Design a protein with these regions (language model features):
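Ribokinase/PfkB-type carbohydrate-kinase core domain
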Residues: 1-110, 171, 177
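Conserved phosphate-binding/catalytic region of the ribokinase-like
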Residues: 49-53, 76-179
Length: 179
């Protein structure tokens, strides 16, 4: 599939991958796209051991707080120093605690989750990843895109269902304006 669609894939400015496709397809796509200078976001869910060369090749990797410990075989107390090793690349989602990233010159940044009534967390991570990419595509810097994505994820958990919970651009902008 990847070979058949190589040209179309490489036309994209940003490629999003997740671990629900075969490992060989992920590895091939990451190498192909990084060699072509494309921006790559990798959501490593479901969590499994990752090839460190592939981690180095992606632009962003977005595990949740449990997945990061499984992938890097570490405990929660070391996640902050792990984020320092991957500045601006390792974005760790933490449910009701929000999302964290280490930004050079600014240190560890944790954006708190919106205080909302949670109905269903299904799809919150997917919403965050998609909104982060949408923010980047709209010209936002990483931290601004992450704020945008965090707001989108906060809105998404207020409804039942992954797709039904995904907010519109207008809803995210309104939530940010009211924040």
């Amino acid at each position: 599939y990847v070979n058949r669609n190589r040209e179309k894939i490489l036309e994209a400015d940003l490629i999003v991958l997740q671990n629900e496709i075969p490992e060989v397809a992920i590895a091939y796509t990451i190498r192909m796209c990084s060699d072509a200078g494309r921006t790559i976001l990798w959501n490593p869910a479901p969590a499994r051991a990752l090839d460190r060369d592939l981690v180095e090749r992606v632009s962003y990797i977005t595990p949740n707080e449990h997945e990061v410990c499984l992938i890097w075989e570490t405990d929660e107390s070391r996640v902050g120093s792990l984020m320092e090793q991957y500045p601006g690349k390792l974005l760790v989602t933490q449910g009701e605690k929000g999302v964290s990233v280490y930004i050079p010159g600014r240190g560890l940044q944790t954006l708190p989750a919106m205080k909302v009534e949670v109905k269903d967390t299904t799809g919150a991570g997917d919403t965050l990843n998609g909104a982060f990419c949408a923010g980047l595509a709209r010209g936002m810097d990483e931290l601004e895109a992450l704020r945008f994505a965090n707001a989108a994820a906060g809105l998404s958990v207020q409804k039942y269902g992954a797709q039904a919970g995904m907010p519109t651009l207008e809803q995210v902008e309104a939530a940010l304006a009211g924040a």
